[in-house]
Amino acid sequence: MPNSQAKKGLFQFYPHNLIWLGLSVLAIVLDQWTKWIASTHLNYADPVPVLPFLNWTLLHNYGAAFSFLSDAGGWQRYFFTSLAGLVSILFVFWLLRMPKKMVVLPVAIALILGGALGNLIDRITLGYVVDFIHVYYQNHHFPAFNIADSAITLGTILLLIDTFFLEKQRPKNSDA
């Protein structure tokens, strides 16, 4: 029997995949809610100790992940906004067309999508990304991050697991 997914048009999707978009929305809501709490209850760059290795520290990130390119001339805001928007559109199409039997890959894509959109909302509305989770050990500090960054990181780890360990086990013609 031919692969039913191959017969789908570009804009057709499997309705069961709406649950993965729900996971993306959950990541966005959790990210934006925690950023709002951090922005309204923390003073900028003033660490609040939580655990011996964790502070809440409100920071504004004008660059990419972990403040990469934050001191560039301002072009990075438009570049990362455009990149996140384009990748998000592609991920939505990819996500909606996943076969039903796949789980790890759509969870990975949904988390990356939710994280990218969470940070995109900040870039568009604020001109920077709100970071507030500050992890450290003694004098070794990891760059501040947020829930969106965590979703992207977890999604990327799951994507790598799927690519290197699970993809080989999938049947070639996975029907929806």
Curated annotation (Swiss-Prot):
<keyword id="KW-0472">Membrane</keyword>
<feature type="transmembrane region" description="Helical">
    <location>
        <begin position="141"/>
        <end position="161"/>
    </location>
</feature>
<keyword id="KW-0378">Hydrolase</keyword>
<protein>
    <recommendedName>
        <fullName>Lipoprotein signal peptidase</fullName>
        <ecNumber>3.4.23.36</ecNumber>
    </recommendedName>
</protein>
<keyword id="KW-1003">Cell membrane</keyword>
<keyword id="KW-0997">Cell inner membrane</keyword>
<comment type="pathway">
    <text>Protein modification; lipoprotein biosynthesis (signal peptide cleavage).</text>
</comment>
<dbReference type="GO" id="GO:0005886">
    <property type="term" value="C:plasma membrane"/>
</dbReference>
<dbReference type="GO" id="GO:0004190">
    <property type="term" value="F:aspartic-type endopeptidase activity"/>
</dbReference>
<feature type="transmembrane region" description="Helical">
    <location>
        <begin position="48"/>
        <end position="68"/>
    </location>
</feature>
<feature type="transmembrane region" description="Helical">
    <location>
        <begin position="10"/>
        <end position="30"/>
    </location>
</feature>
<keyword id="KW-0645">Protease</keyword>
<keyword id="KW-0812">Transmembrane</keyword>
<feature type="active site">
    <location>
        <position position="149"/>
    </location>
</feature>
<comment type="similarity">
    <text>Belongs to the peptidase A8 family.</text>
</comment>
<comment type="function">
    <text>This protein specifically catalyzes the removal of signal peptides from prolipoproteins.</text>
</comment>
<feature type="transmembrane region" description="Helical">
    <location>
        <begin position="78"/>
        <end position="98"/>
    </location>
</feature>
<dbReference type="GO" id="GO:0006508">
    <property type="term" value="P:proteolysis"/>
</dbReference>
<keyword id="KW-0064">Aspartyl protease</keyword>
<keyword id="KW-1133">Transmembrane helix</keyword>
<dbReference type="Pfam" id="PF01252">
    <property type="entry name" value="Peptidase_A8"/>
</dbReference>
<dbReference type="InterPro" id="IPR001872">
    <property type="entry name" value="Peptidase_A8"/>
</dbReference>
<feature type="active site">
    <location>
        <position position="131"/>
    </location>
</feature>
<feature type="transmembrane region" description="Helical">
    <location>
        <begin position="102"/>
        <end position="122"/>
    </location>
</feature>
